[in-house]
Amino acid sequence: MANVTVIVGTQWGNEGKGRIAHQVSKECIAVRGTGSSKAGHTVMIGGQKFTLHLLPAAIVLPNTQCIIGPGVAIDLSILATEIKTLQAMGVKVSPERLIISPRAHIILPYHISMDKMHEKLKGSNKL
């Protein structure tokens, strides 16, 4: 039977899930199940710094397969930039290594405009 490791954050993000996932994902299938590009994580390998927002941190490891799941909201321009940046750094990002769920959500420009408008309307009642 295969080993399964699940990393769950309970602090509204920014608690180090990406770093922990990277440490346990040397040869595995890494899944990003939820979230968007607003948060990010940075991993260091051999003195090289990788900053990621949408892709699982394990994408920088050569023997992993990565999945972006149905609960992820994807800004396509950010994803494309992230992939191009990693490829320029020598990371192989290909359809064989990166699977994107057809049920993942796509962030469109009007979503960003609506989000900005809603935040402005909240005024001092923000969280």
Where are these regions (language model features)?
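Non-transmembrane, aqueous-exposed alpha-helical and coiled segments at domain scale
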Residues: 1-127
